[in-house]
Amino acid sequence: ADSKAKITDWGTNTGAITGYYVGKEWGEIWGFKTADAYFTADEAANGVVLADGSRVGINEVYQKALYKSSFRYGEGDVKYEDLNGDGKVDSGKGTIDDHGDLIRIGNTTPRYEYSLRAGLQWKGLDFDFLFQGVGKREMWSQSSRILPLTQGRSTNIFTNQFDYYTPEN
């Protein structure tokens, strides 16, 4: 069965994409569209990349609205698209009317759920089985295996996370 739900009526409709609003599809995930990666430190520090691939601005880091504390984008980091063409990548006011460059990138609601149950009896011997699953589900995982060093000081770094971008690879 395919399972989708959309909000058609909500009393206090603020329009915030992080809350409930009329037209919201249950389970939607909002995020930024990736464009590529920064391959040099100079590229991370210079120029704004628009959705059409053109660059504007000199010595301007176009993703600065995404910085947290002292983090700065560098070689190997993800580059996001400026979808609304304002020269920066941000989430606007975080509302359905002004969501900046955020778009719907997925949905956490399980879809195409299925199950099969069968049984067999023969000479006092019973055999039953149940097979069930989900045909489609998207997730936004925030575990330390996905985003290391974001879950506190005691977070472990796994061996595969040491294989990061370098200009040589």
What are these regions (language model features)?
Residues 123, 149:
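Phosphate-sensing "switch" segment of ASCE/P-loop ATPases
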Residues 1-106, 148, 158-168:
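Conserved small-residue
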Residues 2-8, 136-142, 152-153:
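Outer-membrane beta-barrel proteins
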Residues 1, 121, 132-134:
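Outer-membrane beta-barrel pore domains and translocons
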Residues 110-114:
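Residues that define the transmembrane beta-barrel architecture of outer-membrane proteins
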Residues 124-129:
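Repeated loop/turn-to-beta-strand initiation elements of outer-membrane beta-barrel proteins
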Residues 42, 131-147:
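Short acidic alpha-helical/loop segments enriched in Asp/Glu that coordinate divalent cations
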Residues 117-119:
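Outer-membrane beta-barrel architecture
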